[in-house]
Design a protein with these regions (language model features):
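Active-site microenvironments in enzyme catalytic cores
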Residues: 2-187, 191, 284-291
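Catalytic-pocket segment enriched in acidic/His residues
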Residues: 5, 136-291
Length: 291
């Protein structure tokens, strides 16, 4: 993967000699096929609502403040703006998550491991909108096993509509490296939630550095911010104590907008029916023998 400066030079050459096509005349695809997708949980307000949905105590766990937390999701089920989305078989609690993602570019003089915050800032190629679709009923069951999420998340992630290169945001960073840009989500044209990207607990450069700690990030990796405050149904369910507003239904249209990037939009459709999952068999534990 070439660096940001070279990508901009190549883009300018193509633009100067190429034929233009109206955006309305093309179907956008996901802006890249990432090697991996990490999704953080970096917004304190979101954590408060989710914690309340699981208990009467809305206190953010102390562990959240100690270091960023993320999970890996599926890079092979990406959706683009305009694509249809359906809940996985057996789920009746489809939800969205309003996020922004950083995309890793060229890593000059590094294999992507143990990056400093300064190196991580330079490694960010650009930013895109990230909708982490979620089946809350499946996710809730999985999380009780103290592992996951897995099947409650891996059926679909929307990235798009494109990647805005990091240089477009450089002057917008505050003194601590945060990006105070607006982000919002609506359902069927009705505003639902909004937040500032700068309300993250850590700026993106620190998230990238943490992801590379005792590990590696590579060109094309996607790192999601986690859900913005008021950026999903489940957070509101936790605050009001019931599933109101209700889970997404076929026909609903979810639109997300981020200042400086654009918007993505997906329509919910009915899903396919699959055979029920076979539960674990209750079996007697055989006594081990030694030789």
């Amino acid at each position: 993967m070439v660096g940001l400066s070279e990508s901009l030079r190549r883009g300018e050459r193509l633009r100067s000699g190429g034929e233009s096509v109206a955006l309305a005349d093309v179907r956008l695809l996901p802006p890249l096929q990432p090697p991996s997708i990490r999704d953080f949980v970096a917004f304190e307000e979101h954590v408060e609502g989710i914690v309340r949905s699981m208990s009467d105590d809305a206190t953010v766990p102390e562990q959240w403040y100690l270091a960023p937390t993320f999970y890996f999701t599926n890079p092979h089920t990406l959706r683009a703006t305009g694509d249809e989305i359906s809940a996985p078989a057996g789920s009746v609690a489809l939800d969205f998550e309003l996020e922004v993602a950083a995309v890793i570019g060229a890593l000059s003089g590094s294999d992507g491991g143990n990056l400093t915050v300064e190196q991580s800032h330079e490694a960010i190629f650009g930013y895109t909108i990230f909708n982490d679709w979620s089946a809350r009923d499946i996710q809730g069951r999985e999380m009780r096993v103290s592992l996951g999420p897995c099947k409650g998340k891996d059926f679909g992630t929307t990235l798009g509509p494109w990647i805005v290169t990091a240089d477009e945001f450089e002057a917008k960073h505050d003194a601590e490296g945060f990006l105070p840009v607006g982000m919002s989500v609506s359902i069927n044209g009705v505003p639902f939630g909004n937040d500032l990207l700068s309300n993250m607990g850590w700026p993106f450069a620190e998230l990238v550095a943490y992801a590379s700690r005792n590990s590696r990030v590579v060109p094309g990796d996607v790192l999601g911010s986690g859900t913005a405050g008021s950026g999903c149904l489940a957070e509101i369910w936790g605050r009001v104590g019931s599933r109101m507003p209700p889970p997404l239904q076929p026909g609903d249209v979810v639109r997300m907008e981020v200042e400086g990037i654009g918007w993505i939009e997906n329509r919910v459709v009915g899903g396919i029916q699959l055979a029920p999952v076979v539960p674990a068999r209750p079996r007697p534990r055989l006594e081990r023998t030694t030789r």
